[in-house]
Amino acid sequence: MTDKIRTVQGKVVSDKMDKSFVVAIERTVKHPIYGKFIRRTTKLHVHDENNEAKLGDVVEVKECRPLSKTKSHTLVRVVEKAVA
């Protein structure tokens, strides 16, 4: 059985938790009436076992089973480190 793992990229907006961080996923949607493209943001709580991701990093995350009330994504890799 070949499952296609759904991954998304986003920017880390908070890394204050232990083994977790919050990532903001940005997407564009078309306004239903006016047709203008608008930026929409979704925040996801992500599990990070080794505390690799830091504030400002661009990361790739994937869906997984629910790990807690809010966490249902895990870190795949850090795509780009934040400039210190």
Swiss-Prot record:
Keywords: Ribonucleoprotein, Ribosomal protein, RNA-binding, rRNA-binding. CDD domains: Ribosomal_uS17. Coiled coil: none annotated. It comes from the Bacteria. Gene3D superfamilies: Nucleic acid-binding proteins. InterPro entries: NA-bd_OB-fold, Ribosomal_uS17, Ribosomal_uS17_bact/chlr, Ribosomal_uS17_CS. Signal peptide: none annotated. One of its GO terms (cellular component) is cytosolic small ribosomal subunit. One of its GO terms (biological process) is translation. One of its GO terms (molecular function) is rRNA binding. Belongs to the universal ribosomal protein uS17 family. One of the primary rRNA binding proteins, it binds specifically to the 5'-end of 16S ribosomal RNA. Part of the 30S ribosomal subunit. This is Small ribosomal subunit protein uS17. The gene is rpsQ.
